[in-house]
Amino acid sequence: MTEFTVHLVNRPGALATLTEQLADAGIAIEALAAFGVDGEGMVRLMVNDPTMTRKILQSDEISFEEREILITTLRHEPDAVAVMTRSLADAGANIDAMYLLRSSAEGLEFAIAVDNHDVAHNILAV
C-alpha cells in the first residue's frame, strides 16, 4: 500500500481543503494521521486511489513524498508489539514510521514503513 506524506501550512482549514479535494475526486481515505511540526502541518495518509491522489497533489503543487507501507496484523496481546518491533530490530530493519490502523478482537492492524522491505516482509509474513 502507498503512504503519502503531505506538507501543508499549519493553519486552520489546510487539512479541510486537502480532504475536500480528495473527496471531490471520489478518493476514499483509508488511514490518516496529521500533526504539526515546527509550524508545518504534516499529513500521512493512505487512500484507495494513489494515482489520482498523486495527480491532485502535483497539479495543486502541494509538497509530498510517497513510500510503500507494509500492513500487518498482530494478535491482541500485551507483548505483540514488543515482539514484532524487537524482531525487526534484531534483523536490522529500521522502523521509519508505524501506526495503528485498527484494533479489534481479531487483532491489531498496523501500517509500518521500514528501510528494508525484504527483511521486514519475511519477518512479518505479509
Give the residues covered by each predicted segment.
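A conserved regulatory-domain signal marking ACT and ACT-like small-molecule sensing domains
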Residues: 1-126
